[in-house]
Amino acid sequence: MPHTFGSRVLVLGGALAAAGALVGAQSRTGTLDPAAPPGEWRYIGGDAAHTRYLPADEITADNFEKLEIVWTWRGDNFGPQVDYVLRATAIYVDGVLYTVAGQRRTVVAIDPGTGETLWTYREPPTVRFDRGMRNNYGKGLASGEIAGRKVIYYTSPAFFLHALDARSGEHVENWGIKVPLPGFPRSGVVDMLPDLVKDWAPWLESGYKYDPNQGIPRDLGNLSTSSPPIVVNGVVVVGNVHEQGYYQTRTENIPGDILAYDARTGKYLWKFHVIPRPGEFGHDTWKNDAWIRTGDVSSWAPMSADPARGLVYVPTNPPTIDFFGGFRPGANLFGTSILALDVRTGKRVWHFQTVHHDIWNFDNPQAPVLLDVTVNGQRRPIVVETTKQGFAYTFDRITGAPIWPIEERPVAASDLPGEALSPTQPFPTRPKAFEIQELTEDNLIDFTPELRREAVETLKHYKVGPLFNPPIQVGHPSGKRSFVSCPSGASNIFGPTVADPETGVLYVATERACRAENLVPGSKMDEPDDPKTTGRTLSQWVVANRGDLRGPQGLPIWKPPYSRIVAIDMSTGEYLWEQPNGDTPARIKNHPALKGLDIPNTGQMGHAVMMTTKTLLITAPGGDPVLYAVDKRTGRRLGTVKLPAPGQYGMMGYVHQGQQHVVVQVMSPTHPGSLVALRLPRAAAGKKP
């Protein structure tokens, strides 16, 4: 049956059995969804707490290597060209898997036992969809119920919210407001752009007539989505995303306000202003009326929630333009912050800004992780945000009080004309940073004296310094070529943090990633005819050169390990262990400059993809096509299983028809983005045929 715009392909109907016989008892706390049957994976992070934990114990260290691939779902044909990216984690609800795929971000329902496609939905084409960014970075879907009926909630790159019947893929009746565009259904959709801009001064003053096909004119701004909504206590909470700040050249954009809708009706409920308006808390952190014209501050990363307490946790990114903020003086709340919002009202309960006046692309890239732990003999409900700076900021998730002291420490000032940085930044005292925060001679490559000399000589051409190193422009009086941002924005962005809620241990995937960058006048990089260029006013400075810091003879300039997994006991803030992620890449082992040397395990050049179960930490190193079983308490590798391609982004699991499954997203330059499901053979699982 051919697929048409705005339609669904129904391949197989009927209810699919879900079973949880193998799932061990799990303590029910405010961090978890008390209504979720054991063995389900209802959120992209497994639970509302985003732990990526499956409380199942069938797969153990003893039988892990008996895992076999039972099906592969390929994403080859879900866009205008083959897509080698699949940045979405499936959810498992009521016996069915749901995910998004391809550059069209098609919604897909999959039989969890066989990998068959059950139905698909693709939104009709619009101009605003074509202007979307990160269209294939949807990360997944959300689920809920309306009068006992399972519903899948989907946010599109064009910024529409859809409510789909989980069984059939049809849009829910009497939900939302009809969109007056060809191919859209009569019901089951909300156009969220009008709710976003209806009280926004630049829109009201523009005189534009709203066009649902075009969306917001690009001289005002543009936004999309790159994570699913989260459904909490009958409320659908929606974040958004803008063009990457390092591509922006103009100072205006739409603020990424957080929106909420009634899950049963699609009715608009509330909006939280991420850039405070006059009279709102934080408005005074925007000087020179910069709040009027500045945008972004969205939540492109997934959100998490504490349903029992009615709180949703929102990680935000910086305001418009990375690496220069002279046009937006002040600390710029609620940029690069953690927000705790009342899900009923949208009111701020507490917040913490992890970077003041962020210009370093240090947006908070991970969903906050919620745990209940015992700290100094007292049971504490906590929330942890792992950041690009290499920190794990930890708070009481009810009050926002830091679990351990966070110190405001002096940082370097900028000598860039027009820039005024914050004189201090917040540094957690515990846990210690999980990534290096300055590139010095002490952490340069030292496999041989010659390689080290080359690295030391290379570093002389760059402006280096501790964390929050100020950017410099091309032609800086120092003669330095660029400034080094260390860590860079890639340190922990692609491998979600996971946790074991039973033990309170957090597992962080981190990659050593420093970058060399410099600035030029905005006119040098502006592309006025690019449909993704937004705003009207050229920035005084924009980033010109974003590149890896090249080491000697093509080797990394820094010492290994190149990537690691770090286990942190969140009751003490101390490391349990840290291990290289995977094994030394072939290009390092076989490098001519290292011939004859005994090179220790450097780890992969990439992020670990992880999930936890009652028995194991399961990881894919991101470089080699393998899956590892790891001892949660020691980090020791316990088993290995081959995959058809390296694992990427998110891993998930579920118990279906009495058997525990692990699903890994795999992809490579020669292997289209796919889902691979593994389970034990019946005999190994101790099951009768």
Where would I find each of the regions flagged by the language model?
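Asp/Glu-centered strand-loop micro-motifs enriched in Gly/Pro and often flanked by an aromatic residue
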Residues: 54-98, 480-488
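Charge-patterned, long linear interaction tracts outside catalytic cores
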Residues: 259, 488-491
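Bacterial N-terminal signal peptides that target proteins for export
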Residues: 1-13
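Bacterial N-terminal signal peptides
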Residues: 11-21
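Extracytoplasmic/lumenal domain signature
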Residues: 63-76, 107-131, 161-219, 251, ...
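Acidic, proline/glycine-rich low-complexity intrinsically disordered segments
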Residues: 30, 36-41, 48-49, 71, ...
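Repeat-blade elements of multi-bladed beta-propeller folds
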Residues: 41-45, 83-106, 132-160, 221-250, ...
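N-terminal pre-domain segments of enzymes
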Residues: 25-58, 423-453, 457, 686-689
